[in-house]
Amino acid sequence: MERFIKEKYPQVSHIVLCGADEEAVKDADIISEATSVEKRRWPVLKPEWIKPGCLIISSGTMDFSDYDFMVKDIRKIVDNYPMYEEYIEIYEEWDENGKRLSSGIPGMYYVNMVDDGKIGRSEVTELGEILLGEKKGRKSDDEIIMVSVGGMPILDVGWGYECYCKAKEKGIGTTLNLWEKPYLY
């Protein structure tokens, strides 16, 4: 991994490889989690590893070892609340005893908290509300914030365009003709 980073990203001057979840996140100012792992084998995040004022950004899945900590001690922010409501309709799973299985997705945890009456809907902030000035961003220096970024399609369009521009710049790729004339033209 270190060789790959040095070859591909020479501007990165400081690399620390970690062998355990705690080592990677303990006392960090920012934790950015973007993992792709087997279901229910997610990285673990324990409250005692998180320092006051930490910003946690999750675009993947994680195992929060203390559900009550999520309910009581973190600021909950999502990119698109209705998207997580839809995720629950599609992806939520239950065990044979009728117990809800963890999804690993913070935004789904937040919707479940609201549905279960543990928090009010107003306790989950959407990024757009912050951008429009309807709600504050950080409320205090000690506030622990967890942002769930679940994959809005517009991000796929943006990344697709970036890939297209890079391929065009390098003269690689295959041009695909999707239509002779657009249908609604």
Predicted features along the sequence, with ranges:
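Redox-cofactor binding/interface segments in oxidoreductases and associated redox assembly factors
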Residues: S32-E33, I57-S58, V78
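Adenosine-phosphate binding glycine-rich loop
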Residues: Y67-Y183
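Rossmann-fold NAD(P) dinucleotide-binding segment
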Residues: K26-D27, E38-L55
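Short loop/helix-cap segments at secondary-structure boundaries that form the rim of catalytic
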Residues: K26, K51, S65-V71
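Short glycine-rich, flexible loops that bind phosphorylated cofactors or substrates
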Residues: K39-R41, F64-S65, E85-E86
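Short glycine-/small-residue-rich Rossmann-like dinucleotide-binding loops
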Residues: T35-V37, G60-T61, Y81
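Charge-rich, low-complexity intrinsically disordered segments
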Residues: V37-R41, W49, T175-Y185
